[in-house]
Amino acid sequence: MQSMHDRRHPTARASRIRRFRVVAAATVAAGGLLISAAMVAGSAMAVGYPAPGGIYAPFTDCPLHDPEMRLAEPGFAMGCIKSVTASGSFSVNGIPVPITQPVTVQFGTYSDTDSNGNQVFHVVPTQDHKVLLTEPEVIPGGFFLLVCLSGDPSVARLCDTAMTNGQTDLEVQVELAGEITNFGPLNLTPFTLPVKVKLTNPMLGGKCYIGSDDDPILLNPMFNPVGTLNFQTDPDPVRFPNVAVLSITGSTLTDDTFSVPAATGCGPGEVANAPINAFLGLPSPSGNNHLVLMNNDALFADDFANGDQARDLLDAFQASR
């Protein structure tokens, strides 16, 4: 419901809505950068609560029940982000790995101010803390290319077994390798998404990775170019005047800044580390690697109320069912 101040001063509410649009647009733009994740299995909202509907239907995993979401300062952005990328590629030293599976990220966010009065955004993971989960990309003959073409005698037995058993394909899967950092509302400023890449083949064992939690690949993707902006207010503007969903669709994101560490844990006694690193040229410095993410759609459900924003947004979700 409008405040007495808004009724007496209609320009105040108009100004507040304009601020909502500007900051929300910047925030969802930043959220759109978080694209190296896949659809999270399981729903935080679904644990004891029906899924939201209408314009809020995409946000079933938003952790609105997490107490941390109530730490937002009054009048500052608080809400839910979901970002989906349809396709792309990840190249190391000119060797590309296609991204053919849709990738999704979704999390909660709130903002407050630091000791210098600057607005700071915080990331709140879903209830199951699976902020990043990707579908594996299958590379036919990938194990043979990475490991066996080297002719390294130390992997000859592995290669013979793989060829005999028809196990020469390779699965490549991106996993989260730490906390998202430097997240903020500036759509031209990338934030940092730490990842590691798991290489899976029966000959490699279950711990073959490029990058690790201690030495991750630090992705800093940026819009290039930004897609189409759309703004949807809540269907009940009297009850929820500060709640809306902003979307940016059809964006492309790129990053050429990240370095790629060497492979570790590959094969018995890690004998496959050396041929994998030699084939890919690992470790690979910044400037030699390239990430392209295409057809990215980012959504941001946000609340700028001056009270309990998380409660207000949750009420809007529940009213949409």
Model region roles, listed by residue range:
Residues M1-A46:
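Secretory targeting and sorting signals
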Residues V47-R321:
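Extracytosolic secretory-pathway proteins
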